[in-house]
Amino acid sequence: MFTLLEDRSRRQFLNNADILKPNLVAPGNLIWAAWSSLGTDSVEFQGENFAMMSGTSMAAPHIAGLAALIKQKFPSFSPAAIASALSTTASLYDNNGGQIMAQRAYSNPDINQSPATPFDMGSGFVNATGALDPGLIFDSRYDDYMSFLCGINGSSPVVLNYTGQNCLSYNSTINGIDLNLPSITIAKLYQSKTVQRSVTNIAGEETYRVGWSAPYGVTIKVAPTRFCIASGERKVLSVFVDAKMNSSTASYGRIGLFGDKGHVVNIPLSVIVKVTYNTTTNV
């Protein structure tokens, strides 16, 4: 059984809650790996050539190595395309077909685990084999991310410091919900919203069937529900989301694209605040 450890890095960022975090999860507990004998970080491993450690610093190298393999197979892939391949092919279940569980910060040991949500595991547990054959990818341009960053209130000095580019050169901005990510996260759903995502086929021609499970308190529809896509072709999917109750509790669903050649594309859908009517009162 896979269990996600309670960790400070396993958090949804509330400042930009329309972007799912974490993206996905990878092996990071008790990882036995090479270690510099000159390292002084841990006294117990001084002089050793191998060490066993846990944490995000152990999970990240797994993802970095797999990203390098994807780039080797698909040299033209952008960072966004690589991230998409990793996310859309991630596993939702453990090797025995059981649910991935998440540790909770409860004092009672009998209730300190529950099924993981996208806010715990992102798209799921990284699948190395699947990531090298994703079928469809969600790609984005560098300028898309720059437009998003420049649209964050007060971000201009930070963007200039880290990228050397002035936000004044970007005439329009992009909201987090509109980035072409392999996930959909809506922080505040007022009545209804339409979200679009574009997919690009990096495999052979294939026909996809679209299925979904809606988050609690929400109804969704996806158009088209079936499409044929040629190699290299791009298709736009429209996701219509409607609130059916007033709630501030996050709920989760998924959209799946099922290809007739065996490709399966997994898209987590999360909605936090749901409002079915306009609560603004004129005085």
Each PLM stretch: what is its role?
Residues M1-V283:
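Loop-rich non-cytosolic ectodomains and luminal regions
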